[in-house]
Design a protein with these regions (language model features):
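A structural signal for short, well-ordered beta-strand segments and their strand-loop junctions
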Residues: 61, 85-87, 173-175, 223-225, ...
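Flexible glycine/acidic-rich beta-alpha junction loops that bind and position SAM and/or redox cofactors
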Residues: 92-96, 170-189, 224-239
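Single-residue recognition of alpha-helix boundary sites
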Residues: 27, 146, 186-188, 237, ...
Length: 521
């Protein structure tokens, strides 16, 4: 962001004290802006004001009234004229998942009454000329441009009113909200898309503020956006290997049932053997009834395990054939709509959903996902993706489709002789920083790649976290763990439970794993 944004004089926003420490150090261009949001204490404000005193263009945005009083106090102590911004709580709100981030229910911002109180306070403290910026935020990933335009109109009147009151505001920070078209629909009907382009967003933002300024004879403001999602989402791709698959059992076409097979098996075999389009609904109902009866008999010890397994294989074979027939029909019975989801394979993949795609788990965010090899082959399987955590929530079962949401991903059958990789796109916003170490899976390996006219360059390779690093985060000292194991192994050797060579091999494997990758290798 810093290197590529330098020619655009790109500024940075800090939403907390730790972020401010990072921003001050990396934003070396003294002419670019630093906007300070979030809750602030005296040390946060002092750090910002001292950085301003040394030449940084820092704006302290007041989120709550008490912050303004702290800014006035610290500015007087440090003998500096602060650049003050005020976050205004608009009545307008966004649309989509984060609609409640704006409007009257917003966590941050001053109401109209609080704004007047703040203006009176600044005037009484001789800080009237220090109010340089107003800010609003109506939520992330705003799906409808109409909501953005409504908020802009409302905010523009605050700009006009403040100028009329003698507060010469220079900047209007229109916050975040610029959305990303994750699912490709370019529609406000989906929370994973938006019904506008970046150009339309820019046109509306500028024209609204320019028009209202011209009508009231006041200067055009400098417009700031905090479009972090739109700026970063496209830069990152998550790639992982499929380790193995699991499919539902099926009956071998060449297999014939034994004459003494259980009557339920014989009945279900007859349904499978005579299945056709005309009889498929009746066959489906009969198959379900037989399966339920067989499971009940098994639970009471009347049917043995072999019979249960035969029932399962026949039942799922019938389900597959019915689904194949139904998919070819224009108007298939409603009962068959969920069969494709039910029949999907499970592809177990070398990643943690909670570490690398937390939004997929937490808010059902849908990302573009596809295999990245064998693209000249038609996929022959349908699958959901399972991660390697021990949590049943660690799966992706919703995918982008040309028709609403698909509950499986078209994939290829695995080949024993070659790996199979799947990629998840548009993961550059929020996913890495929100990642959770569920089951102690850490950060993944990362590669920084730049694209040019001749192709691409690998700029940097960053190793993922080791087991030792992750254990250290949760207060397990790796060296102490090794010492504990050494004591235990020595005791086991002395007691004759293992040989000396076996003990050495165990410790070698333990140390190697401790300082190795948290994912499967």
């Amino acid at each position: 962001i810093i290197s590529h944004g330098k020619k655009f004089n790109l500024g940075l926003e800090a939403g907390s004290k730790p972020e401010l420490h990072a921003v001050i150090a990396v934003n070396t261009d003294s002419d670019s802006l630093i906007v300070c949001n979030g809750y602030k204490d005296e040390s946060y404000i002092e750090l910002a004001l001292l950085a301003q005193k040394m030449g940084k263009r820092i704006f302290l945005v007041v989120e709550k009234m008490n912050e303004l009083k702290l800014i006035a106090k610290m500015a007087k102590q440090l003998n500096v004229q602060p650049n003050i911004g005020i976050r205004i709580k608009l009545a307008s709100s966004g649309s989509g998942k984060w609609e409640e981030s704006g409007g009257d229910a917003s966590k941050f911002g001053l109401t109209s009454s609080e704004l007047l109180e703040a203006l009176d306070f600044m005037e009484s403290k001789g800080l009237k000329d220090c109010l340089k910026l107003i800010h609003f935020h109506i939520g992330s990933q705003v799906t409808k441009i109409r909501r953005i335009k409504t908020a802009l109109r409302e905010a523009s009147q605050f700009y006009v009113q403040l100028h009329a009151m003698g507060f010469k505001v220079e900047f209007v920070d229109i916050g975040g909200g610029l959305g990303v078209d994750y699912d490709g629909t370019r529609s406000s009907n989906s929370e994973g898309s938006v019904n506008y382009s970046i150009q339309e967003y820019v046109n509306d933002s500028i024209s609204t503020l320019v028009d209202v300024s011209d009508k009231n004879g006041i200067p055009h403001p400098n417009i700031i956006t905090e479009s972090g999602r739109a700026l970063t989402a496209h830069h990152s791709v998550l790639i992982f290997e499929v380790l193995e698959t699991a499919t539902l059992p099926e009956w071998d076409d060449e297999e014939v049932i034994a004459p003494d097979a259980h009557e339920l098996v014989q009945e279900l075999y007859g349904i499978w053997d005579s299945l056709n389009q005309n009889k498929m609904l009746e066959a489906w109902h009969d198959a379900q009834q037989i399966r339920e009866e067989a499971l009940d008999l098994f639970s009471h010890g009347i049917v043995d395990l072999k019979t249960r397994a035969q029932i399962e294989r026949l039942y799922w074979s019938i389900t597959r054939e019915i689904n194949q027939i139904a998919e070819g029909l224009k108007h298939a019975p409603d009962e068959f709509r969920g069969l494709s989801k039910l029949l999907a394979d499970k592809y177990f993949c070398n990643f943690s959903l909670f570490q690398s795609l937390p939004d997929s788990w937490a808010i059902d965010q849908i990302f573009p996902i596809m295999p990245i090899q064998r693209l000249d082959e038609k996929p022959d399987r349908s699958a959901t993706l399972q991660d390697i955590t021990c949590d049943s929530d660690g799966k992706i079962a919703n995918f982008i489709s040309t028709r609403n949401v698909a509950h499986y991903l078209p994939v290829h059958s695995l080949k024993k002789t070659e790996p199979y990789y799947v990629a998840v796109f548009l993961v550059g916003a929020y996913q890495e920083i929100l990642g959770d170490m569920h089951n102690l899976f850490g950060d993944t390996n990362a590669v920084h790649v730049s694209v040019n006219e001749k192709g691409y360059n690998i700029e940097q390779i960053i190793d993922g976290e080791t087991v030792a690093e992750v254990l250290d985060y949760v207060q397990y000292n790796p060296k102490k763990l090794v010492r504990t194991l050494e004591t235990w192994v020595t005791k086991s050797v002395k007691e004759g439970k293992i040989s000396l060579e076996e003990g050495k091999e165990f410790l070698s494997n333990y140390r190697s794993g401790l300082y190795g990758y948290t994912y499967l290798e």
